[in-house]
Amino acid sequence: IQLHPDEKDPYCLQIFESLSYEANSEFEQAPSTCYQHSKPDYAQNPNTLFDHSVPTQWQCLNYTDKRSIEMSGRLFGGCLDTVGLLLDSPFLALHEFKKHNASQGIVLYLESAELTPATVARFLLSLKLAGMFDDINGVIIGRHVTLQGQDPGFDYRQGLNAAFGGCLFPVIIDADIGHIPPNLNLINGALCTITADVEQGKVTNSSVVTKLA
């Protein structure tokens, strides 16, 4: 995230607000109206502010019928480019985190910065085979515009379907997470409840409530 002092984006400002919250505080977030498609050169133009011009539309990967969904638990996640490389290392202790928080469960969040669709699929399948998707309550995945159309023989959604096809828990994609602003303020280890309505794969009336407990 580019934290420019003149930036008025509420998602940016939420980061600083959350730093002042006391234990057991709650805050609620909702999907953005629009996101930024362009990639400014901050080295050449360091005072560039966000330009949110493309309509945001969260999607549900595995539910297309009309229904309400909810996922709740402790947040755990990060950038897939890094998480995938930490698999089976002591620095990705998800199994221990699951055991410690078994009563609340886990909401996993992921996004990718520079991976191709095929690499996204490989990383996700590696995590799946390692049991990372076992006994979790849901997944929320950030958008990555540069992946669209990057490989004409294998697109981004195919990669996600390869890993999450058949999963019973909700899988929300194209969310406000990652390297394409704006970004939700997700805090590892915090309790989170995500509710939404789904119809024809589109997500509406979304709410992300985080509790610092």
What function would you assign to each model-found segment?
Residues 1-81:
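Conserved anion/nucleotide-ligand pocket segment
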Residues 17, 80-88, 121-124, 157, ...:
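Predominant activation on well-ordered alpha-helical scaffold segments within soluble catalytic domains
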Residues 17-29, 85-92, 129, 165, ...:
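Generic secondary-structure signature for well-ordered alpha-helical cores
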Residues 26, 63-70, 95-102, 197-202:
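Intrinsically disordered, low-complexity coil segments
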Residues 57-63, 103-104, 137-143:
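Short acidic (Asp/Glu) and glycine-rich catalytic loops that position anionic groups and cofactors
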Residues 65-70, 107-114, 140-147:
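Glycine-rich phosphate/diphosphate-binding loops and the adjacent beta-loop-alpha structural elements
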Residues 74-120:
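Oxyanion-binding "anion nests"
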Residues 116-213:
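C-terminal active-site/capping subdomain that shapes the small-molecule cofactor and substrate pocket
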